[in-house]
Amino acid sequence: MMRIALFLLTNLAVMVVFGLVLSLTGIQSSSVTGLLIMALLFGFGGSIVSLLMSKWMALKSVGGEVIEAPRNETERWLMDTVAQQSRQAGIAMPQVAIYHAPDINAFATGARRDASLVAVSTGLLQNMSRDEAEAVIAHEISHIANGDMVTMTLIQGVVNTFVIFISRIIAQVAAGFLGGNRDEGEESNGNPLIYFAVATVLELVFGILASIITMWFSRYREFHADAGSAKLVGREKMIAALQRLKTSYEPQEASSMMAFCINGKSKSLSELFMTHPPLDKRIEALRSGEYLK
């Protein structure tokens, strides 16, 4: 329900901005129909393809290996833990994978709640207690149960569409104003070089600004996944897991994977551009019960 509400509210906000831009620039809506269709195709196309290929891409990026049959006691424990927590959360058993990395980390991905993947690093299995590891796995199971991957795709698609459409509308106006040779009664599309240059710069700038929205949601869903873990295995286990993460190596996963991992990179120019809240804030949120209500 929340996923649909977020999608509708975001789309409503985008359409309001579209209307304002068209009114302020004097551009007729019929002249931008093709541009809107293109923006939708490009904006959602990349996000949807990424979602559909997310399991394959994630495994390739970290060199993960799916466990088909447990080969040792650790793999058996991991499979049993994921199976038990999946039943508790009311989702189908995800695929389970292990990848080699010294940092303590794990991630969940997949296009659907009932066709997902949970992967953990060897660093997690080697450096966390079973209670702490259970909490991390429960955090990832909560991401799946909450439908976070799909929600992130919808938000990213709307944001992408907004960036493409607004950038090119402004570029069209700028090209017509700066480079058009317009006779009375004739319409000019302006200088194509100016249009291309302005559109490229604006897409870059608006893309950076728009990432604030997606990063905010990424941080928001981390708080809720922490709370989901606390409900599955207990608050103290999740707090202990987060405290253990404070002593971990800086994550080595690719930047494109950070939003899906439990342990995000701590170095950023601003918290606005972080995929994860600071660990201290996550611990405090659990202690206060802010997201457990």
UniProtKB/Swiss-Prot annotation:
Belongs to the peptidase M48B family. Binds 1 zinc ion per subunit. GO terms for molecular function: metalloendopeptidase activity; zinc ion binding. The active site is at 140. Its cofactor is Zn(2+). It comes from the Bacteria. Keywords: Cell inner membrane, Cell membrane, Hydrolase, Membrane, Metal-binding, Metalloprotease, Protease, Transmembrane, Transmembrane helix, Zinc. The chain crosses the membrane at residues 4-24, 32-52, 158-178, 193-213. InterPro entries: HtpX_protease, Pept_M48_protease_HtpX, Peptidase_M48. It is an enzyme of class 3 (hydrolase). It is found in: Cell inner membrane. The keyword ATP-binding does not apply. It is a multi-pass membrane protein. Pfam families: Peptidase_M48 (PF01435). Its EC number is 3.4.24.-. CDD domains: M48B_HtpX_like. This is Protease HtpX. The keyword Cell membrane applies. Zn(2+) binds at residues 139, 143, 222. The lineage of its organism: Bacteria, Pseudomonadati, Pseudomonadota, Gammaproteobacteria, Enterobacterales.
